[in-house]
């Protein structure tokens, strides 16, 4: 399950326990001007600078939809799985002194065939599920022209239904969220030691 809420300690790293799995929190903060900010706190890799995400949406910001798809489909080779593993992906190190080193390091590590396949799977599922969600929620009257080429298993599978349920949950929270408040999603998705909730950005428990 993807947990909504929770945050690492002030050091930016989670306390390690015996048998503890590395985790990552990605916080989506609603900002004025139809923008949203993403902040990553993770166990592995350099600390990352926050960045504004693409594709603002009143219910499902683009990168939040991707996170939920990759988490439910267990796509560890997708964008967020790679970030949790220590890569920067679409982010960059908060310490500018590490930027060149990180770029060199990642340029030497080419994605595997499995990672390429999972990234493509993430794009396909996110595109299809966002359209399905908008149709079901009444935010779209008809599908786009490419939709009739989508394989039927992508439209009617149990995985698709589970993703749509996650999108429903997030969309309701995000739409009701005041500007300046945030929702935090935890990776890996089966980590249950986070409490649900939304709170003002920067707030500490």
Q: Residue locations for each model-derived region?
A:
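N-terminal amphipathic/basic-hydrophobic helices that include classical n-h-c signal peptides
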Residues: 1-23
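Auxiliary, metal-adjacent structural segments of Zn-dependent hydrolase domains
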Residues: 17-35, 42
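Short amphipathic beta-strand/extended segments with alternating polar/hydrophobic composition
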Residues: 46-55
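Active-site recognition of the HExxH zinc-binding catalytic motif
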Residues: 62, 66, 70
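Metalloprotease/metallohydrolase-associated module, dominated by Zn2+-dependent proteases
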Residues: 24-27, 56-61, 76-82, 88-205
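Canonical SH2 domain fold
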Residues: 38-40, 50
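Hydrophobic/aromatic-lined pockets within catalytic cores
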Residues: 69, 73, 77
């Amino acid at each position: 399950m993807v947990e909504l809420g929770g945050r690492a300690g002030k050091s930016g790293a989670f306390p390690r326990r015996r048998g503890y799995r590395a985790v990552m929190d990605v916080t989506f903060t609603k900002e004025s001007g139809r923008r949203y900010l993403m902040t990553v706190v993770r166990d592995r890799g350099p600390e990352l600078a926050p960045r504004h995400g693409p594709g603002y949406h009143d219910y499902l910001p683009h990168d939040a939809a991707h996170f939920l798809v990759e988490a439910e489909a267990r796509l560890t080779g997708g964008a967020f799985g790679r970030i949790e593993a220590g890569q920067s992906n679409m982010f960059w190190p908060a310490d500018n002194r590490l930027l060149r080193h990180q770029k060199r390091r990642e340029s030497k590590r080419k994605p595997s065939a499995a990672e390429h396949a999972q990234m493509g799977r993430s794009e396909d599922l996110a595109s299809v599920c966002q359209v399905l969600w908008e149709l079901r929620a009444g935010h779209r009257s008809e599908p786009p022209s490419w939709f009739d080429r989508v394989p039927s298993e992508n439209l009617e599978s149990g995985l698709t239904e589970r993703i749509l349920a996650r999108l429903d949950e997030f969309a309701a929270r995000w739409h009701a969220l005041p500007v300046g408040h945030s929702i935090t999603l935890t990776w890996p998705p089966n980590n249950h030691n986070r409490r649900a909730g939304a709170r003002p950005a920067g707030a500490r428990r």
